[in-house]
Amino acid sequence: MLHSIAFAPAADLHGRVADSSREGFARAMDISCHSFARMARLAAPLMQGGGSLLTMSYLGAAEVIDNYGLMGPVKAALESSVRYLATEQGPQGIRVNAVSPGPLATRAASGIQHFDQLLADAAERAPLRRLVSIEDVGALCTFMASDASRSMTGSTLYVDAGFHILG
């Protein structure tokens, strides 16, 4: 089962984290992070005998990314939730992981300031000298949802042409 929902109010997304509103922070956390925990709880009875829960993260969870603002701490909480949920759901045979794509030209990403420059920089700097495609992300998600990944849980997997190793 795939969780791919994220949101932060524009006023809080583009500003400093310290200046984010309490309401905006809570809303971003509820929609982008807590919704995954709720999904895990509701999906568990449907996954008798095991299964796979996936969520989508981003490098901004582990490193400061310009113009990513409030979503960085929210995605960090999401990745931490993956580890806790993996521990809780593991005894039922349910694997829990996050997929962290590199920059993708999507409608959601268009809300990030200077995103076109981020795309160009990522393609130039990534060890494979290219951006990832939606098909690349889909292939990893397909693998993670399959029994071929039966021994993988609690992980964040990067599909970003190596961009995350640059620090």
Where are these regions (language model features)?
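N-terminal Rossmann-like NAD(P) cofactor-binding module of classical short-chain dehydrogenase/reductase
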Residues: L2, A6, L54, C141, ...
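Catalytic loop of short-chain dehydrogenase/reductase
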Residues: A6-A44, G49-P91, P103-A105, F163
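Short-chain dehydrogenase/reductase
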Residues: A40, V82-R83, G138-C141, A145
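A glycine/serine/threonine-rich, flexible loop-to-helix segment
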Residues: N67-L70, P91, P101-A126, L166-G167
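Short, small/polar-rich loop/turn modules that mediate ligand/substrate recognition or access, typified
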Residues: G90, R95, M152-G154
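Conserved SDR Rossmann-fold cofactor-binding beta-strand/turn motif
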Residues: R95-A105, A145, Y158-D160
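A conserved structural motif in NAD(P)-dependent oxidoreductases
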Residues: A126-V137, A148
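Short C-terminal tail/terminal secondary-structure segment
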Residues: C141-T142, T153-G167
